[in-house]
């Protein structure tokens, strides 16, 4: 099991390195930070001094190796906008992003899991059709469209909630609900599919034939087995919390990590962008590892297989 987890960590770190490397190259080839930050009217001497100060006058391969050498020493670079540590700049926004993503995760689970189970248990009834209709709508409608619709209804027409900002807890309601509903739709669809597959297995019919109450069959046999594939999509949603906040934070002017990423890309604040991408990659790595561990807890057979594979 340890060998298996180490291999997963190694592959994940390689993936994160490739993502950061691709971003490193693309950002440096897509525009000159000196022009964007100083403005096109700045004198040539200012441009040269800026590039020299930030090492942008060196070949890109030299910048690349210097960057990763600094990363391995714990130096993730400084923001080109204000000179502060990029890690500090991003760290200041993390609590604001967590303030909407964690409640949104609760909404996803609280709505998506029961809805998916209900749709499977009442397959081909009006309950199933209603849940799937809402799920498909939430799954296919982009989050920024849903956010704009909710803002139009609750902020503009009804005036119950603010449409943007972060001054009070009320400002967090619409972005939280937007992210929560989109994720709930995804979880409901996957949970329904997993439950239907399990309910069609022979051991479910055998348990029913033995005279067990249907609720006991569902609770003791169907739900634990359906949880395994459902954990995969939940792990993905947890891992993409920061990435998923980019659009929603921009729509509602919520000053979290997602909006910071949009501004940093537009301003070519290279170190800040790379720190955020590193954060996103590590979050996904941690979520995937947690899901792998939960697999072994939910289904010991998987743990045994991995132990055998690692031995």
Tell me what each language-model feature is.
Residues 57-113:
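An internal, D/E-rich "acidic patch" concept
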Residues 2-4, 16, 88-127, 143, ...:
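Alpha-helical transmembrane segments of integral membrane proteins
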Residues 138-146:
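A hydrophobic, multi-pass inner-membrane permease signature
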Residues 42-75, 172-173, 204, 253-264, ...:
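Short hydrophobic, aromatic-rich alpha-helical segments embedded in or entering the lipid bilayer
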Residues 15-65, 155-174:
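Hydrophobic alpha-helical transmembrane segments of membrane transport/permease proteins
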């Amino acid at each position: 099991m340890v060998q298996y987890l180490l291999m997963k960590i190694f592959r994940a770190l390689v993936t994160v390195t490739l993502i950061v490397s691709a971003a490193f190259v693309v950002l440096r080839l897509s525009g000159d930070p000196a022009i964007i930050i100083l403005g096109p009217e700045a004198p040539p001497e200012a441009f040269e001094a800026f590039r020299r100060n930030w090492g942008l006058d060196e070949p890109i391969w030299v910048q690349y190796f210097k960057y990763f050498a600094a990363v391995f020493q714990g130096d993730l670079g400084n923001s080109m906008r204000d000179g502060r540590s990029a890690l500090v700049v991003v760290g200041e926004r993390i609590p604001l992003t967590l303030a909407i993503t964690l409640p949104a995760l609760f909404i996803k689970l609280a709505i998506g899991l029961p809805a998916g189970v209900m749709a499977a248990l009442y397959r081909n009834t009006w309950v199933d059709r209603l849940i799937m209709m809402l799920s498909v709508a939430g799954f296919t409608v982009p989050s920024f469209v849903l956010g704009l619709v909710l803002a139009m209804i609750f902020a503009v027409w009804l005036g119950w909630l603010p449409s943007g900002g972060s001054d009070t807890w009320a400002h967090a309601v619409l972005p939280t609900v937007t992210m929560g509903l989109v994720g709930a739709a995804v979880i409901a669809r996957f949970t329904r599919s997993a439950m239907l597959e399990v309910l069609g297995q022979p051991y479910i019919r055998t348990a029913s034939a033995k005279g067990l109450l249907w609720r006991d069959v569902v609770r003791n046999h169907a739900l634990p087995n359906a949880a395994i594939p459902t954990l995969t999509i939940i792990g993905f949603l947890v891992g993409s919390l920061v990435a998923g906040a980019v659009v929603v934070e921009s729509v509602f002017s919520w000053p979290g990590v997602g909006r910071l990423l949009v501004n940093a890309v537009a301003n070519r604040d290279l170190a800040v962008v790379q720190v955020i991408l590193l954060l996103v990659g590590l979050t996904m790595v941690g979520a995937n590892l947690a899901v792998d561990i939960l697999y072994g807890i939910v289904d010991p057979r998987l743990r045994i297989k991995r132990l055998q594979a690692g031995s």
